[in-house]
């Protein structure tokens, strides 16, 4: 089937009480493997390119490869930019055919984060892309994540003034492997969800690697509909390579390298399968996709200074021949 709108995927997650996995890639051979495993599981999936990966994986090439693989599948597939480095990169992802983009202004001052995220939202919506913002920085240890958790009232102000469709929250989650068991602040997550309910903004959890299953399920109950995974996938992929090299320490012929890479991909796909089961997204095919009822509250355009307008684009335009099904 054609690529699906990210917001349609998230809407179904919210209605049916599960989360979609957002799986980072670092090569053009990975989307097909991941989508095949998602197809086997009957699970929707978001295939994600992080902003830092653009020099290695061209956005347009990535979008075309992923869209081609999605057409062969019967499960909903979206393409997402994670942690977009700046507005220019975010625009390139929109033009390439991503169905959603994340502009990460979390390291900026609050007002500058609001200002630039609002520009990203205006730009993304003119391309038909959903836009994710981040409030509260994701650290790499307990020491720094406790200092920068998302404030519920600030989250309300941020969403109201920017109009973001998806908000990445910091509630004790972190990138990379956790040193010990992560302690998610569920009370804070519940407060954030209640604060944002009038605005139709979806919540996403980054740093999903290593979070226990009961914490994942509780997070979903409290409104998380998208969970990002990368570290675990890389770890399992590397284990696949190591296992292959242990069995075949010397060059074995023309298929040696392809077989080694296939072992790595199998590790990636196994990680996706484990996560999809934990996120309760298996067996969720196309039925019921569609936008949520109720209209999203528009951003408060009087809440800040004027921002530059961007050139208008046709709604739903997708560069490079990539498109998604706008009738789902």
Give the location of each predicted region.
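C-terminal alpha-helical cap/extension of soluble enzyme domains
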Residues: 212-328
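Short catalytic-loop micro-motif centered on adjacent basic/acidic residues
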Residues: 20-24, 79-80, 102, 203-206, ...
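Short gly/pro/ser/thr-enriched loop/turn and capping motifs at secondary-structure boundaries
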Residues: 53-55, 108-110, 233-238
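Alpha/beta enzyme core
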Residues: 6-16, 26-52, 60-76, 84-199, ...
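A short N-terminal beta->alpha junction/helix N-cap motif
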Residues: 18-26, 50-54, 259, 263
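Ligand-binding grooves and catalytic loops that recognize ribose/phosphate and carbohydrate rings
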Residues: 55-71, 262-274
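Generic enzyme active-site microenvironment
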Residues: 80, 132-134, 204, 275
């Amino acid at each position: 089937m054609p690529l699906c709108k990210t917001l349609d995927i998230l809407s179904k997650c919210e209605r049916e009480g599960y989360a979609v996995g957002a799986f980072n890639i670092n090569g053009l051979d990975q989307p097909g493997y991941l989508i095949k495993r998602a197809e086997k599981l009957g699970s929707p999936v978001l295939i994600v390119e992080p902003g830092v990966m653009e020099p290695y994986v061209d956005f347009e090439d990535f979008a075309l490869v992923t869209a081609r693989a999605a057409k062969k599948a019967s499960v909903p597939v979206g393409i997402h930019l994670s942690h977009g480095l700046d507005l220019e990169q975010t625009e390139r992802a929109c033009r390439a055919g991503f169905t959603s983009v994340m502009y990460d202004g979390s390291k900026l001052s609050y007002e500058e984060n609001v200002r630039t995220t609002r520009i990203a939202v205006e730009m993304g919506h003119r391309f038909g892309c959903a836009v994710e913002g981040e409030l509260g920085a994701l650290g790499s240890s307990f020491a720094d994540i406790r200092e920068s958790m998302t404030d519920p009232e600030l989250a309300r102000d941020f969403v109201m003034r920017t109009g973001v469709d998806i908000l990445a929250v910091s509630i004790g989650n972190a990138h990379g492997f956790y040193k010990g068991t992560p302690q998610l602040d569920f009370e804070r997550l519940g407060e954030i969800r209640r604060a944002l309910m009038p605005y139709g903004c979806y919540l996403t959890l980054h740093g999903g690697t290593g979070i226990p299953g009961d914490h994942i399920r509780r997070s979903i109950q409290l409104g998380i509909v998208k969970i990002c995974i990368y570290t675990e996938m890389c770890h399992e992929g590397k284990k696949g390579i190591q296992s292959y090299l242990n069995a075949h320490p010397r060059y074995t012929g023309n298929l040696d390298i392809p077989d080694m890479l296939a072992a790595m991909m199998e590790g990636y796909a196994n990680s996706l399968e484990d996560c999809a089961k934990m996120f309760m997204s298996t067996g969720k095919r196309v039925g019921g996709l569609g936008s949520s009822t109720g209209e999203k509250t528009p951003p408060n355009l009087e809440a800040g200074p004027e921002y530059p307008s961007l050139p208008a684009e046709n709604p739903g335009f997708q560069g490079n021949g990539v498109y998604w099904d706008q009738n789902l």
